Amino acid sequence: MYFNNELSNLKDHLLVTLQNNSDVERDRINFILWDLKFLDCFLHLKRLPFASECGMLEFSQKMIEIWKIQSHREPYDCPYWKEVIWKTKQEFRAEYSFPNTSLAANKVDDVSPKFVMEVIDVFVENLNVVVKINDPYSWLFVPEHKEQIEQVLKELKLLRFFVCFVSNKCIEPQYRHTTFYIHALIEASHIAMVVWLHLPVLNGIVNQYLAPSEVSRLRSDFMEMKIKSIQPDISRNNIYIDVLQALKSTIPQAQNKHAVESGIVETPTQNLTVGLSDQMVNLQEMLCFLRDNLIHLPILDLEFHLQDMDSVIVDAGLLIYSLYDIKGEKEDTVLDNMNRALGFDLPRNIEPIKAMVYLVMQKAFQSNLPRVHGLGYVDFLLKNLKDFQGRYSDSLAFLKNQLQVIQTKFESMQPFLKVVVEEPHNKLKTLNEDYATQIIRKAYEVEYVVDACINKEVPQWCIERWLLDIIEEITCIKAKIQEKNTVEDTMKSVIASSQLARTPRMNEEIVGFEDVIETLRKKLLNGTKGQDVISMHGMPGLGKTTLANRLYSDRSVVSQFDICAQCCVSQVYSYKDLLLALLRDAIGEGSVRTELHANELADMLRKTLLPRRYLILVDDVWENSVWDDLSGCFPDVNNRSRIILTTRHHEVAKYASVHSDPLHLRMFDEVESWKLLEKKVFGEESCSPLLRDIGQRIAKMCGQLPLSIVLVAGILSEMEKEVEYWEQVANNLGTHIHNDSRAVVDQSYHVLPCHLKSCFLYFGAFLEDRVIDISRLIRLWISESFVKSCEGRSLEDIAEGYLENLIGRNLVMVTQRDDSDGKVKACRLHDVLLDFCKERAAEENFLLWINRDQITKPSSCVYSHNQHAHLAFTDMKNLVEWSASCSRVGSVLFKNYDPYFAGRPLSSHAFSISRILLNFKFLKVLDLEHQVVIDSIPTELFYLRYISAHIEQNSIPSSISNLWNLETLILNRTSAATGKTLLLPSTVWDMVKLRHLHIPKFSPENKKALLKKSARLDDLETLFNPYFTRVEDAELMLRKTPNLRKLICEVQCLEYPHQYHVLNFPIRLEMLKLHQSNIFNPISFCISAPNLKYLELSGFYLDSQYLSETADHLKHLEVLKLYYVEFGDHREWKVSNGMFPQLKILKLKCVSLLKWIVADDAFPNLEQLVLRGCRHLMEIPSCFMDILSLQYIEVENCNESVVKSAMNIQETQVEDNQNTNFKLILIEIHLFYLFDMKGIESISTDMKEKKLTVTRDVDADEVQLVVEKLRNVAYADEVQLVVEKLRKRGML
């Protein structure tokens, strides 16, 4: 908007003229708009005498006449008009001078602060345009003076802040400060006039029109643009002092103008150019801290302290501006004179400023902390405080006493925090959790203050004061706890820590919908001969996925189909990932070629399904386009193939339907609702009659929605079975949950113990519909300090208890359990729960997702995001943009990848990810998924506790030991580095906090240096994929890791002078996987691991003597897997009585075993026997008939005699032993078809039934797929024979 109507009309006419001329570039138009905007402002000042006296109005009118001529002249000649404008402004420059009129002569009663700010805003806007121009051909390009103009722009903004501050704080009539406002107008106008007069710059002809002296004066104009004095006879500082003293006399009431305060603080600090004492230097430092932190203070805190801040700002301004007019005296004299003249005592007046600076810094930090915490954070802090004081003793010397007191205080609170974790649900629990939260927040503050001290980011006086306050606050918290005797009262009711997971495991058996299940089952098994889509739709939480999975796993259904495959789509999906998921189910994991393009995978899926009857489950479809993508892969050959599809949307269900109408899944009826609630709360038991009425009322309140019912059941199952408590739940639920499933989730979250809230919200960091690996989840929980230590139990065991508790509350769904011990291996969250976790985590400053299409920019909300505990990114560009704004973030979780970066080293790009990560100075967890390759490990981030990433290098820098907090190091290798041995520096053994080290095929870099080192990794629990070529190397590494629980390693012909040297593994070792790279070489050591439960040997040459001697050292072994093993002693294995007393699972795959002799009591506790590819084995020993614990035998690709013996065992187990739970699975892959054929026509597979059928004449690509499949599921010798026959036929 223009102030002057004539100029506005001229602007419109010029634009029309120029836009009709195709030769006029946009840059020229921008310059015209820029120039006219300045002229408009200059004319707006015509009522002020100074505008006429300095020539501003006259110059403006002449320039307008030139533009009028331009607007009527054709054709438009850019170079000519640029020269005309330049010459005209050159003439103006010769006549223009700084306004020297008196301020009194310029007083105009209606000059308001609003008017002043409007003018300054226009000038700022126009100068912003100039500093952003980098094109040397632009008319607005400033080649040599951009830095000076940026300083000018800063001064203008500060002046505007000052005007705004005075205007907002002044309760007197504004005319009292007219002198100040006129002064601001004159200075701003002069700045704008100087810049306007020097643009545009003529490229290459500057010197033609400017003499060297003029160029020098031009530069001088810019260099002197910092505001010095308004005129020779009047001091600008006197004007400022007068207005500040007027403000000081009466401070106005608080207003929501915190941005003004943060801006005005910068004004005095910019002008401290005179010599100052040390105290004044401190004042400048304090005002800088006040400026930097003030804008981050929440409005409520700001309003509460606004009057004090106003007073501090005014006093600081008075102190500084009073010094400007005093020159030529010594500093001490200056200060004395100033104190006497103005009644100031500088040291005494600095104290309130210091107090306000500290208060603002403290409040700004505290108010933006995450509101959900892990109780293990105090454990982490206590360890770090000791390390900090050792590593940074010089920096922290003056804090030694305070830190020791704080350490003692936190240690004294550890028993209380343990009580909070272990106590049951009772009336004191909420109060205790509040105290625990206060303690954790103090721990966050200590960490920040100590780091700020080390890095000299906060002044020493502030740090000392902050720590003293922390000590006082912790003392106060402890006193409150002791006063209420909460520890003693609660300890009486503390249950054993083993009862953390006391809630019965979630019963995954479906309840209700019996009529719906029967209807759908009939549609799947009967109906049309053609392909049919059975689609279900309905609102979230109805149980669509649960019902679909029930049908998909129903034996009476599955047995009628050759192939079964499923995929979960979700709102954001990858077409290729869906195809891969379906192919893995259809043909097996080992046969899927992930490197193929999506179109090739789609064609492979179609050919796989073409001749077979298939059952496909496509879950959670959001759009019709998903069905368009997938439907072409599902051929219809009139063999009653079926597809189950679930969606929230009726339109999608209808779009995908073929013959059957879409099924709208109904709500539960009242009977089903109560039946489900009762089942989830009481398991196989019945509800007490006293609770039945209130229980049925609660079930009815859940709105007949299954998800709501199971969530409420999770709440009830954790409470005392008393009517009083159930009434409380009913009252809290209210009536609104009928239409709001989030209300039920919110209630479930509300009653969670504080140590589980952070664990639950952390699920929000995972992508929708993703299966979550439990080992990885637990490692992350521990690294995030969610898990509170407990003497006598490992953190992993405690975390498993947390998980089982969440499962028992029906907040987490189990997707896979371990066959041997029943522990959860994988889980997922319902979409409704996942959405809740993401939303609530953002509200609590706990977790923030930065998505590819993120609207909010980092600059708009820096501090709130800076304080989030965790950030999840889905795009590398987001990571770059946000890194500078998130220095205090504790975790960076990268959940997707830009294809440009996937699988490639970032060092070759314009920026490196390691350099970007250095901005996250408090980073504790770095979890990079999907093959994001880091160019180097960020060894400067010493807070890091968890790293998971991909690397391409074949070595790790020795500086890795700088990460002295690191507990988990997971480095995957890119395809380019696969197979190469990675060299691990000896400094890794100095990283004594390491708990998990996972690196494919690594070896110590300097074994001699490692041998000399006395350091050990006593905390290391899992070690994956070291590579050994000598027994001595293995022994050395095992000595360095005495507390290992899991070990996976690769060996190559370990040489040792004695054939059966005993290799002593750590006493706590529970899982061992040994793989030999050179297949069928003898194993040169005997395994001794007294507590080993899981042993897997692959690629070795073994005999009965070796296995017998090894078994003597493995009396607690529960799982034994022998893969690709060559048996000596004429391919015979003798198992004597008592060799494997605790063995539960025995798997033999592709072993050259011919004769198997087993004593009657060799496997007294065996539950599962799996034989795959044992084509030389004659039979399964008959003693397996009498093993009463046996539940399962699987035979795949073995001789008929083995199959027959398995069937005999089944008959005896079921009929004679009455073992009704016994199962026999026979899997057959017909390799012999390939040996007798002269050609091949077609290939089909059924991995569900484990059948392979091959006929004649197909192309070589399909044959190659079959061969790859055989290599994964069949015996190696026969596959090689098949390959040779195919080569001879010219097919490979």
From Swiss-Prot:
HMA domain mapped to chain residues: 1211-1278
Binding-site residues for ATP, renumbered to this chain: 538-545
Residues in the signal sequence: none
Database matches in CDD domains: RX-CC_like
The entry's keywords: ATP-binding, Coiled coil, Cytoplasm, Hypersensitive response, Leucine-rich repeat, Membrane, Nucleotide-binding, Plant defense, Repeat
One cellular component term from this protein's GO annotations in UniProt: membrane
Residue stretches making up the NB-ARC domain: 505-792
Record's function text: Confers resistance to late blight (Phytophthora infestans) races carrying the avirulence gene Avr1. Resistance proteins guard the plant against pathogens that contain an appropriate avirulence protein via an indirect interaction with this avirulence protein. That triggers a defense system including the hypersensitive response, which restricts the pathogen growth.
Further remark: This protein is encoded by the haplotype C genome of the allohexaploid Solanum demissum.
Family from the record: Belongs to the disease resistance NB-LRR family.
Name of the protein in question: Putative late blight resistance protein homolog R1C-3
Organism this protein belongs to: Solanum demissum
